[in-house]
Amino acid sequence: MAAATGLEEAVAPMGALCGLVQDFVMGQQEGPADQVAADVKSGGYTVLQVVEALGSSLENAEPRTRARGAQLLSQVLLQCHSLLSEKEVVHLILFYENRLKDHHLVVPSVLQGLRALSMSVALPPGLAVSVLKAIFQEVHVQSLLQVDRHTVFSIITNFMRSREEELKGLGADFTFGFIQVMDGEKDPRNLLLAFRIVHDLISKDYSLGPFVEELFEVTSCYFPIDFTPPPNDPYGIQREDLILSLRAVLASTPRFAEFLLPLLIEKVDSEILSAKLDSLQTLNACCAVYGQKELKDFLPSLWASIRREVFQTASERVEAEGLAALHSLTACLSCSVLRADAEDLLGSFLSNILQDCRHHLCEPDMKLVWPSAKLLQAAAGASARACEHLTSNVLPLLLEQFHKHSQSNQRRTILEMILGFLKLQQKWSYEDRDERPLSSFKDQLCSLVFMALTDPSTQLQLVGIRTLTVLGAQPGLLSAEDLELAVGHLYRLTFLEEDSQSCRVAALEASGTLATLYPGAFSRHLLPKLAEELHKGESDVARADGPTKCSRHFRCLQALSAVSTHPSIVKETLPLLLQHLCQANKGNMVTESSEVVAVCQSLQQVAEKCQQDPESYWYFHKTAVPCLFALAVQASMPEKESSVLRKVLLEDEVLAALASVIGTATTHLSPELAAQSVTCIVPLFLDGNTSFLPENSFPDQFQPFQDGSSGQRRLVALLTAFVCSLPRNVEIPQLNRLMRELLKQSCGHSCPFSSTAATKCFAGLLNKQPPGQQLEEFLQLAVGTVEAGLASESSRDQAFTLLLWVTKALVLRYHPLSACLTTRLMGLLSDPELGCAAADGFSLLMSDCTDVLTRAGHADVRIMFRQRFFTDNVPALVQGFHAAPQDVKPNYLKGLSHVLNRLPKPVLLPELPTLLSLLLEALSCPDSVVQLSTLSCLQPLLLEAPQIMSLHVDTLVTKFLNLSSSYSMAVRIAALQCMHALTRLPTSVLLPYKSQVIRALAKPLDDKKRLVRKEAVSARGEWFLLGSPGS
């Protein structure tokens, strides 16, 4: 009985398998194949059992039945090939090889089975060769469908990947067999595979035997690629994919050179732009593989074709590719090793280039002068030898032409060509200065440059400045006398009149570059002149002379900062600038805030330049920072007769400029040096310790946190700049006391500048404070101060500012308390007094600051804080908007608009459908800030989410047109930009509104503001073109 039960259990699965096979083969159902494969993978059946169940189907007299049987077996093998044993693979391959001779209906399924077996790790040695021989012999690949041809290429690819040595054993027969398979292929999907196979044949050193030309012919027949992908191509194959794949084949071996180069020359000389580009790019790629031997016979023809394209083409792309090809050709010839008796192909090639180009450099009309120069420079840039050969021949000619031509624009053209050759010289190093090709021309070059610098033409002066910079960058070309003259010219150009600003800027930039290389020359010849100019400027400002004198003074400040590019020069310019401030502080000048701000800007630029050199940076910090603090402290002291400047130094704008200098001079300090500085500056503010300040005999104590004057309290802005720029790991002395004093000042004084400075300082330090008990104590104090301040009529504004900055400090670092503080901020949106400010506060929370809480100042700023803030708070803002009274809704809209406007667009797009209605409502808000913020948010969305925006086109058109008449110029401009962006929506959606929009946009064409008119013209033009052919 038990034996009978076991027999039934064995028979039952086979019966189920036969049923599935029958359903697939005879019932034409596809599902059973996956079921059989799943059962084989789970161990329900073996592959042998599947073959047995298919027995009658595989032997059936009807080809379609045999094909279905083979198809089922192949589909199972494609999913289960990893489970096969070596013995099973052998039997299956013998079976499939035999069936390659079967009816043409059966062959595609057989090929699928062989593809599965080509991926099996159990494939015994020798069978890969056997399979490929059978395919090459029995299968007429060209008669197969695309998918079946793709299968053949896949089999070859799999075997080349796993059985390389076996296939190489076939020798050239494998290459010949593959040529037969590839011949006549047209489908781009298959060609990509075929090109990779050919590339592997060559790169992996398979034997090509006598079939090199045949292999070239079977691939080059596709050159140049003219494939255009169909619309909505599901395969994603682009023309560029095929071009690059074919190019990799054609440029993979020098053995193709004798066949390929004539083809490239023919295509370059054709009239088809794409063929020219493809051929030149392919030639460029070939030069990396070829040598002189391959190029020798084709050089005259290649040069003639390239020259013609550069001289005659109307396409900048063809010109650029032609020049790149010439560069590569010259580099290839330069790299080849010459035998003693070999012909110097590089020399003769360069001589041909010179012969065909040099006479164009001398033509009076200078018609082909630029194309000739470009060709010469493309070749010269390829190697040191080419550069030396061409430069030594061309430079004398160009120098002669410069003197022959008297017009400034012609001289400018020639000098620009000379500049091109000078730049090329910088690529190559020469151990011996006398070997430099430019050494014999240096006197003529310097003379020519100085002529250009004194020419009335601004454009020629600009080229002269650039040429001087390049000359100076090459050692040994500028003598001491040349340098003195050069510095004199740069000094003169720095003080040119207003209409020569471009020359002034270029002169300043050149001075900075050359001062790095020749600090001694600039120290001797320029700094004394600038010091004298600065002293004259002091007296000019004191006499309140005309704007010309003042502008010279400002230019002098710019020049001092521009040349501060070398440590030795910084040690001279920094004292000059600081002394200039000190002179003003002594009351010797009638000074305006703009003057002090200008000096501070120069100091900041010097500090930025010093950041690259730690030693120079520390010198700047230890020299400038104490001096600036001393000046500010002196200015804050009560005096019977305070100077005008002392009052100026305490103005908001000037303190902000001083703070920027101090911050810039601190951010790059090492922790060790920063620790030295912080032990002096914090006690200055907490204890009035002025001992480290220069000239520290002050008439009164400095106590900004006690009962000091309002002027002293304002200097907390400078403390903020310093401590909020320190590295996070620098310990701040008396931190607990400092934080309490800052908190006290943030809500304890009526001066907004002082209280905001203290608030920012508190927030900056809070952000950097490591987690722990001390941080929690500071937070408790801050929250208590905020709540107490909000409850008091006299300090509500200061308390709100504190809430805002503390919230930002915590949002940036993902602190849990930030959620509670943000909720508190949202609650204030309904406050009659603070609601509008609370809405604007969301802009601060989402924006990057420039003074505190910056990454440059070492603040703890998490990368995705905006995304997190959006996710955590926008739902509450939306909910609050819906629940708020009508008069409060604008505040919620403003807050929401600020958040969305500063959110990365990829984060906003998925949420757009739910938020768009609110954004549209925000456009109706009377607040111009809300309107502008919302328009700024919507404009990129019109470009990036046209399908969603199309659903609201009626509302968008109406609201944008209304806002194009807003009283705010910024809103009008933004609305017109959105009208322009609307044209990116589907044309069919926009056409019903075309005439309405064109009429409405006629009004802003007459706007009184030029920028509004400009946007109106642009937008109206795009709407006019809607629906026209080619739009």
Curated annotation (Swiss-Prot):
Keywords: Acetylation, Activator, Chromosome partition, Cytoplasm, Cytoskeleton, DNA damage, DNA repair, Nucleus, Phosphoprotein, Repeat, Transcription, Transcription regulation, Ubl conjugation. It is found in: Nucleus; Cytoplasm, Cytoskeleton, Spindle. The modification Phosphoserine is found at residue 1028. Gene3D superfamilies: Leucine-rich Repeat Variant. SUPFAM superfamilies: ARM repeat (SSF48371). HEAT repeats lie at residues 867-905, 909-947, 950-988, 991-1029. Key component of the cytosolic iron-sulfur protein assembly (CIA) complex, a multiprotein complex that mediates the incorporation of iron-sulfur cluster into apoproteins specifically involved in DNA metabolism and genomic integrity. In the CIA complex, MMS19 acts as an adapter between early-acting CIA components and a subset of cellular target Fe/S proteins such as ERCC2/XPD, FANCJ and RTEL1, thereby playing a key role in nucleotide excision repair (NER), homologous recombination-mediated double-strand break DNA repair, DNA replication and RNA polymerase II (POL II) transcription. Component of the CIA complex. In the CIA complex, interacts directly with CIAO2B and CIAO3. Component of the MMXD complex, composed of CIAO1, ERCC2, CIAO2B, MMS19 and SLC25A5. Interacts with CIAO2B; the interaction is direct. Interacts with ERCC2/XPD; the interaction is direct. Interacts with ERCC3/XPB and NCOA3/RAC3. Interacts with RTEL1; the interaction mediates the association of RTEL1 with the CIA complex. Interacts with BRIP1. This is MMS19 nucleotide excision repair protein homolog. It comes from Mus musculus (Mouse). The lineage of its organism: Eukaryota, Metazoa, Chordata, Craniata, Vertebrata.
